[in-house]
């Protein structure tokens, strides 16, 4: 019966962690391939 606590954990996870991983992976991709 703890489903009401799921969004309060899941929203910051998607809103902060996912963009951080996406930015980090994009940065590493650019550094690896020397696009810039």
From Swiss-Prot:
UniProt entry tagged with the keyword Transmembrane: yes
Matches recorded under InterPro entries: PSI_PsaI, PSI_PsaI_sf
Topological type in the membrane: Single-pass membrane protein
Subcellular location: Plastid, Chloroplast thylakoid membrane
Alphabetized UniProt keyword annotations: Chloroplast, Membrane, Photosynthesis, Photosystem I, Plastid, Thylakoid, Transmembrane, Transmembrane helix
Transmembrane segments: 10-30
Superkingdom in the source lineage: Eukaryota
GO BP terms in the entry: photosynthesis
SUPFAM superfamilies, sorted: Subunit VIII of photosystem I reaction centre, PsaI
A GO cellular component entry from the record: chloroplast thylakoid membrane
Record NCBIfam families: PS_I_psaI
Family: Belongs to the PsaI family.
Role: May help in the organization of the PsaL subunit.
Identification of the protein by name: Photosystem I reaction center subunit VIII
Gene name in the database record: psaI
